[in-house]
Amino acid sequence: MRWRPVACVVLGVTAVVCSVIAATAPPSPPPAPPPAVSSSEASFHSVRSYADVAEPVRLRIPALGVDAPLTHLGVAPNGTIEVPADFAVPGWFDQGPRPGQPGPAVILGHVDSKAGPAVFYRLNRLPVGAVVFVDRADGSTVDFRVRGTQHVAKTAFPTDLVYAPTLEPSLRLVTCGGPFDHSRSSYLDNVIVYADP
């Protein structure tokens, strides 16, 4: 599976994504997994031709007041996923699908910094049904509706739910959350938002 090796590094990277202020909220149940796909459906969709979509350039989450440009995130020389250099700018993992292409497009953002709240500070409060817009370089926009938020210990990161291929477009927003471990300067949990068109 193409995404599994890269996805496994998320556990190490999420410590870098987070900084100082803990934002806590009661845990919510994980969203339902995507529907199972029979091998005949997978065969049909795997040969289906999907139109190429332009690169994502901006993320808008009206329910949170987020309206920010997107940066590209790749794989660092040590094999981990890069993290956004700017705490106010989320990053799209450009080794995965573009938002609107089949599969899970993944966008990472910081929860906070030593200076205060960052772009995904209130991500854990994003309600089911909220709309997330991704603007693309060609002027088009793809919108996703939140279907669930998962709070999970970094040691139990759900790699398959976040990165496993899907037949339809989907979006994952990932940040840190939960208790802050001062000895490691890292949050202990991840907040993952699952959204579909």
Residue ranges and their predicted role:
Residues 1-13:
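N-terminal export and membrane-targeting signals
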Residues 12-128, 133-140, 145-197:
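Solvent-exposed, non-transmembrane regions of membrane-associated and secreted proteins
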